[in-house]
Amino acid sequence: MMETIRNYLSYAGIQYRNPDKSGDEREKMLELRHKGQEARKAFTNLAKTFQASHLEWQLQQTSQWMNQAQRLRPHFWAYLQREGQVTEPMLALRLYGKPSDFGISLEVSFIERKKDEQTLDKQAKVLELPVVEGIYYLVYSNGESHKVEATEENRLLLREKVRNQEIRKILVKS
């Protein structure tokens, strides 16, 4: 399963075209589609395995293997919803990295295109919880993201920055 996902990551960013309209590259496009579909299936199976141990969470659809520009995605994700609306924060299993250094993160996140006026405030409530071992914060501000160590001092600093709207969103990852 993980080998299929690792192999797919080396194709991230490649432009995909309909094989029937690709001329000499038809076989290459068929192979890319096969690699993408197999990797997505493997990631979906991984997410199902996780969800089977956490029955209170409902698995949502896995992201597609290519984006709207028809480039092979550099990652996959699957949301797990516990209760409430799709505007509520959820858990997300997310593939990240490159073939030589990749992993799966579990994070408190939300579906960006389905957020409402309260979503970011609700999601920032993760900063009201005490720090636990094995987590870190992924902070988004000014269109950039960066990793912040999960310490009590950083948690309090990030809470203040969220209040002052210096930070757009923050994810808790492990």
Question: How would you name each of these model-derived features?
Answer:
Residues 57-95:
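Amphipathic, interaction-prone secondary-structure segments
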Residues 7-10, 31, 48, 78, ...:
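Polar/charged alpha-helical tracts
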Residues 45-65, 132-148:
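Short glycine-rich, low-complexity/disordered patches
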Residues 34, 100-166:
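Compact, glycine/acidic-enriched structural inserts
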Residues 1-61:
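N-terminal domain-onset segments
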